[in-house]
Regions:
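Signature of long, low-cysteine stretches enriched in small and polar/charged residues
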Residues: 87-133, 139
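A short acidic-to-branched-hydrophobic micro-motif
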Residues: 61-84
Length: 162
C-alpha cells in the first residue's frame, strides 16, 4: 500500500501541470471604428468666385477682388478649436448662433480683426454632423463692405450638406 501511495503521489502532483490550449473567438478581436464618409457641401457662390484659386483635399479658397471665401472640411471633435481656427478668437468672445438643419448642427458667427490693409470683417458657418465640421468663411475689408454687390445672406443660406 505504501508503494502504491508513493507511486500515485507524483501523478497527483503533476496532474494540474498540463498546458492548456488558448482559444480565441470572434468576440475577442477588437473592432476598429470606421469613419463615416464625408458628405458633399452645396453652396451658391457669387459668379466671380466660380473657380477656386487654391484647392486641397480638405478645402478650397476663392479669391475675389474685395473678399475671400474659404470652404473646408475638418474632423469633428472640439468645436471651440474649429471656431478658434476659423476666426482666431475663442468661442466665449464671440456670439455664436446655433440652429439645427438637415441632420447637422449649424453654428453662425461674425468677427472683426485688424488686417494688413486695415480692418477686416469675417463671417463663418459650421455644419457639424458629428463626424466632420463643414465650414465656410468669408473675409473682406471693412471699407469694401459698402461696395460689395454680393448678397451674402443668399450665399450663407445656400450653404448645406447633400
Amino acid at each position: 500500500m505504501k508503494k502504491l501511495f508513493w507511486m500515485l503521489l507524483p501523478l497527483l502532483l503533476l496532474a494540474g501541470c498540463a498546458a492548456r490550449e488558448t482559444m480565441e473567438t470572434l468576440g475577442d478581436i477588437p473592432v476598429e471604428g470606421t469613419a463615416a464618409p464625408q458628405r458633399q457641401i452645396s453652396v451658391k457662390l457669387p459668379d466671380e468666385a466660380a473657380v477656386p484659386t487654391a484647392e486641397s483635399d480638405s478645402g478650397r479658397i476663392y479669391l475675389c477682388k474685395d473678399y475671400e471665401i474659404i470652404i473646408q472640411t475638418l474632423e469633428a471633435g472640439d468645436l471651440d478649436e474649429t471656431i478658434r481656427t476659423l476666426s482666431g478668437y475663442d468661442r466665449d468672445s464671440l456670439t455664436v448662433m446655433k440652429t439645427r438643419a438637415e441632420g447637422a448642427d449649424r453654428y453662425d458667427f461674425v468677427w472683426a480683426a485688424a488686417g494688413e490693409n486695415g480692418e477686416r470683417l469675417g463671417r463663418a458657418v459650421i455644419l457639424d454632423d458629428g463626424n466632420y465640421h463643414y465650414t465656410m468663411t468669408v473675409l473682406k475689408d471693412a471699407e469694401a463692405t459698402k461696395k460689395t454687390q454680393v448678397v451674402w445672406r443668399t450665399v450663407f443660406e445656400s450653404f448645406s450638406l447633400v
